[in-house]
Amino acid sequence: MNKDITKEKELYFELYELYKNRLKTKHLTLEAFRFERESASQLAWAAHNIANGKWEVNGYFPFNVYHPNRVINAPFYQDRIVEQWFVEKYIQPVFKPKLHEYNMACQSGKGPFLAMDYVKAAMEEMYYMYGDQWYVFQYDIEGYFDNISHKAAKKIMKRIGKEGYAIYEKIVDSFCIRDGYAALEDPENPNGYGYPKGTLPSQWTGIILLDALNWQIQDAPG
Protein backbone atom coordinates (compact mmCIF):
# COMPACT_ATOMS: atom_id res chain seq x y z
CA MET A 1 0.00 0.00 0.00
CA ASN A 2 2.79 2.45 0.88
CA LYS A 3 4.42 1.73 -2.48
CA ASP A 4 1.17 2.57 -4.28
CA ILE A 5 0.78 5.79 -2.30
CA THR A 6 4.37 6.80 -3.05
CA LYS A 7 3.84 6.21 -6.77
CA GLU A 8 0.62 8.20 -6.66
CA LYS A 9 2.36 11.12 -4.95
CA GLU A 10 5.19 11.06 -7.49
CA LEU A 11 2.68 11.12 -10.33
CA TYR A 12 0.82 14.00 -8.71
CA PHE A 13 3.94 16.14 -8.44
CA GLU A 14 4.95 15.31 -12.02
CA LEU A 15 1.53 16.39 -13.26
CA TYR A 16 1.55 19.47 -11.03
CA GLU A 17 4.97 20.63 -12.26
CA LEU A 18 3.86 20.21 -15.85
CA TYR A 19 0.64 22.09 -15.09
CA LYS A 20 2.57 25.01 -13.55
CA ASN A 21 4.85 25.21 -16.58
CA ARG A 22 1.85 25.00 -18.88
CA LEU A 23 0.30 28.05 -17.21
CA LYS A 24 3.39 30.08 -18.13
CA THR A 25 3.08 29.38 -21.84
CA LYS A 26 -0.64 28.91 -22.53
CA HIS A 27 -3.40 31.50 -22.68
CA LEU A 28 -5.79 31.23 -19.74
CA THR A 29 -9.02 30.16 -21.43
CA LEU A 30 -12.33 29.82 -19.62
CA GLU A 31 -11.82 26.06 -19.51
CA ALA A 32 -8.36 26.52 -18.00
CA PHE A 33 -9.71 29.03 -15.47
CA ARG A 34 -12.37 26.58 -14.34
CA PHE A 35 -9.79 23.82 -14.08
CA GLU A 36 -7.50 26.02 -11.99
CA ARG A 37 -10.17 26.36 -9.31
CA GLU A 38 -10.13 22.59 -8.84
CA SER A 39 -6.62 21.83 -10.06
CA ALA A 40 -5.41 20.12 -6.87
CA SER A 41 -8.28 17.64 -6.73
CA GLN A 42 -8.32 17.14 -10.51
CA LEU A 43 -4.60 16.35 -10.67
CA ALA A 44 -4.80 14.15 -7.57
CA TRP A 45 -7.64 12.18 -9.13
CA ALA A 46 -5.73 11.80 -12.40
CA ALA A 47 -2.63 10.61 -10.52
CA HIS A 48 -4.71 8.14 -8.54
CA ASN A 49 -6.26 6.67 -11.68
CA ILE A 50 -2.93 6.46 -13.52
CA ALA A 51 -1.27 4.74 -10.55
CA ASN A 52 -4.07 2.19 -10.39
CA GLY A 53 -4.29 1.59 -14.13
CA LYS A 54 -7.79 3.08 -14.29
CA TRP A 55 -7.17 6.32 -16.15
CA GLU A 56 -9.35 6.77 -19.23
CA VAL A 57 -9.75 9.54 -21.78
CA ASN A 58 -12.78 11.65 -20.81
CA GLY A 59 -13.75 12.34 -24.40
CA TYR A 60 -13.23 15.04 -27.01
CA PHE A 61 -14.98 18.21 -28.12
CA PRO A 62 -14.96 18.93 -31.86
CA PHE A 63 -14.54 22.33 -33.48
CA ASN A 64 -13.80 23.56 -36.98
CA VAL A 65 -10.67 25.35 -38.12
CA TYR A 66 -10.02 26.84 -41.51
CA HIS A 67 -7.17 27.20 -44.04
CA PRO A 68 -7.23 24.28 -44.49
CA ASN A 69 -10.73 23.30 -43.43
CA ARG A 70 -10.72 20.46 -40.94
CA VAL A 71 -12.32 19.28 -37.72
CA ILE A 72 -10.19 19.27 -34.58
CA ASN A 73 -11.17 16.91 -31.76
CA ALA A 74 -9.61 18.37 -28.63
CA PRO A 75 -9.36 16.46 -25.34
CA PHE A 76 -10.67 18.05 -22.17
CA TYR A 77 -8.26 20.07 -20.06
CA GLN A 78 -7.32 17.38 -17.54
CA ASP A 79 -6.66 14.94 -20.37
CA ARG A 80 -4.47 17.48 -22.17
CA ILE A 81 -2.26 17.69 -19.09
CA VAL A 82 -2.09 13.90 -18.72
CA GLU A 83 -1.38 13.43 -22.42
CA GLN A 84 1.39 16.04 -22.42
CA TRP A 85 2.93 14.35 -19.37
CA PHE A 86 2.63 10.98 -21.10
CA VAL A 87 4.29 12.18 -24.32
CA GLU A 88 7.15 13.88 -22.49
CA LYS A 89 7.76 10.94 -20.16
CA TYR A 90 7.32 7.96 -22.46
CA ILE A 91 7.28 8.85 -26.16
CA GLN A 92 9.85 11.62 -26.57
CA PRO A 93 12.76 9.92 -24.73
CA VAL A 94 12.42 6.83 -26.94
CA PHE A 95 11.65 8.31 -30.36
CA LYS A 96 12.89 11.90 -30.46
CA PRO A 97 16.64 11.03 -30.64
CA LYS A 98 15.95 8.72 -33.60
CA LEU A 99 13.89 11.10 -35.75
CA HIS A 100 15.35 12.35 -39.00
CA GLU A 101 17.08 15.71 -38.45
CA TYR A 102 14.75 17.38 -40.98
CA ASN A 103 11.66 16.25 -39.10
CA MET A 104 10.42 19.60 -37.83
CA ALA A 105 7.11 18.88 -36.12
CA CYS A 106 6.39 18.92 -32.37
CA GLN A 107 10.00 19.58 -31.33
CA SER A 108 11.31 22.51 -29.33
CA GLY A 109 13.73 24.63 -31.35
CA LYS A 110 12.33 23.45 -34.68
CA GLY A 111 9.03 24.17 -36.41
CA PRO A 112 7.84 25.74 -39.69
CA PHE A 113 10.23 28.69 -39.74
CA LEU A 114 13.31 26.48 -39.43
CA ALA A 115 11.81 24.20 -42.07
CA MET A 116 11.48 27.19 -44.41
CA ASP A 117 15.13 28.07 -43.79
CA TYR A 118 16.16 24.55 -44.82
CA VAL A 119 13.99 24.67 -47.93
CA LYS A 120 15.36 28.08 -48.89
CA ALA A 121 18.96 26.88 -48.48
CA ALA A 122 18.25 23.75 -50.54
CA MET A 123 16.64 25.77 -53.33
CA GLU A 124 19.54 28.22 -53.44
CA GLU A 125 21.96 25.31 -53.73
CA MET A 126 19.91 23.77 -56.55
CA TYR A 127 19.81 27.06 -58.46
CA TYR A 128 23.58 27.35 -58.07
CA MET A 129 24.20 23.80 -59.31
CA TYR A 130 21.50 23.34 -61.97
CA GLY A 131 20.03 26.72 -62.83
CA ASP A 132 16.32 26.16 -63.41
CA GLN A 133 16.65 22.54 -64.55
CA TRP A 134 15.21 20.91 -61.45
CA TYR A 135 11.88 20.49 -59.71
CA VAL A 136 10.36 20.34 -56.24
CA PHE A 137 8.16 17.44 -55.20
CA GLN A 138 5.54 18.37 -52.60
CA TYR A 139 3.14 15.74 -51.34
CA ASP A 140 0.34 15.36 -48.86
CA ILE A 141 -1.34 12.22 -47.55
CA GLU A 142 -5.07 12.62 -47.94
CA GLY A 143 -6.95 11.90 -44.73
CA TYR A 144 -3.78 10.86 -42.92
CA PHE A 145 -4.94 11.14 -39.31
CA ASP A 146 -8.45 9.91 -40.12
CA ASN A 147 -7.01 6.66 -41.44
CA ILE A 148 -4.11 5.84 -39.13
CA SER A 149 -4.23 2.17 -38.21
CA HIS A 150 -4.54 1.59 -34.47
CA LYS A 151 -2.82 -1.75 -34.92
CA ALA A 152 0.20 -0.19 -36.64
CA ALA A 153 0.39 2.60 -34.07
CA LYS A 154 0.26 0.17 -31.15
CA LYS A 155 2.91 -2.04 -32.70
CA ILE A 156 5.48 0.73 -32.95
CA MET A 157 4.58 2.17 -29.53
CA LYS A 158 5.40 -1.07 -27.74
CA ARG A 159 8.94 0.32 -27.69
CA ILE A 160 7.98 2.73 -24.90
CA GLY A 161 7.62 -0.09 -22.37
CA LYS A 162 4.74 -1.83 -20.67
CA GLU A 163 3.74 1.00 -18.33
CA GLY A 164 3.61 3.65 -21.05
CA TYR A 165 2.02 1.30 -23.57
CA ALA A 166 -0.91 0.61 -21.22
CA ILE A 167 -1.70 4.33 -21.25
CA TYR A 168 -1.13 4.68 -24.98
CA GLU A 169 -3.51 1.83 -25.73
CA LYS A 170 -6.30 3.65 -23.91
CA ILE A 171 -5.56 6.88 -25.76
CA VAL A 172 -5.51 5.35 -29.24
CA ASP A 173 -8.64 3.26 -28.64
CA SER A 174 -10.60 6.26 -27.31
CA PHE A 175 -11.27 7.57 -30.82
CA CYS A 176 -12.04 6.21 -34.27
CA ILE A 177 -13.22 7.33 -37.70
CA ARG A 178 -15.67 4.81 -39.12
CA ASP A 179 -16.26 6.48 -42.49
CA GLY A 180 -12.61 6.94 -43.53
CA TYR A 181 -11.29 5.00 -46.49
CA ALA A 182 -9.24 2.68 -44.24
CA ALA A 183 -12.22 1.70 -42.09
CA LEU A 184 -14.50 1.27 -45.11
CA GLU A 185 -11.99 -1.13 -46.65
CA ASP A 186 -11.87 -3.16 -43.41
CA PRO A 187 -15.55 -3.61 -42.41
CA GLU A 188 -14.68 -6.28 -39.85
CA ASN A 189 -12.66 -3.72 -37.88
CA PRO A 190 -14.56 -0.40 -38.20
CA ASN A 191 -13.23 0.96 -34.90
CA GLY A 192 -9.57 0.31 -35.71
CA TYR A 193 -8.70 3.47 -37.62
CA GLY A 194 -8.43 7.19 -37.06
CA TYR A 195 -6.73 9.48 -34.59
CA PRO A 196 -8.00 12.88 -33.39
CA LYS A 197 -6.26 15.84 -35.00
CA GLY A 198 -4.79 18.32 -32.56
CA THR A 199 -3.64 16.13 -29.66
CA LEU A 200 -0.01 15.61 -28.71
CA PRO A 201 -0.18 11.79 -28.84
CA SER A 202 -1.73 11.95 -32.31
CA GLN A 203 0.89 14.41 -33.58
CA TRP A 204 3.73 12.27 -32.27
CA THR A 205 2.16 9.09 -33.60
CA GLY A 206 1.83 10.76 -36.99
CA ILE A 207 5.44 11.87 -37.27
CA ILE A 208 6.81 8.58 -35.90
CA LEU A 209 4.86 6.46 -38.39
CA LEU A 210 6.09 8.64 -41.26
CA ASP A 211 9.69 8.94 -40.12
CA ALA A 212 10.75 5.81 -42.01
CA LEU A 213 9.69 7.59 -45.20
CA ASN A 214 12.03 10.49 -44.38
CA TRP A 215 14.98 8.11 -44.17
CA GLN A 216 13.90 6.28 -47.33
CA ILE A 217 13.82 9.54 -49.30
CA GLN A 218 17.28 10.43 -48.01
CA ASP A 219 18.82 7.02 -48.69
CA ALA A 220 17.21 6.53 -52.12
CA PRO A 221 16.88 10.05 -53.58
CA GLY A 222 16.55 8.75 -57.13
Q: Which functions belong to the PLM regions below?
A:
Residues N2, V87-Y139, G143-S149:
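Active-site-proximal segment of RNA-dependent polymerases
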Residues K9-T25, E56-F61, E88-F95, A182:
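Short, compositionally biased low-complexity segments
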Residues N21-F33, F63-N73, H100-Y102:
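Glycine-/proline-rich flexible loop or hinge segments
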Residues A40, A44, D79-Q84, E88, ...:
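Non-catalytic, well-ordered alpha-helical scaffold segments
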Residues A46-P68, I81, I167-E185:
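Reverse-transcriptase-like RNA-dependent polymerase core
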Residues A122-G222:
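Conserved polymerase palm-domain catalytic core
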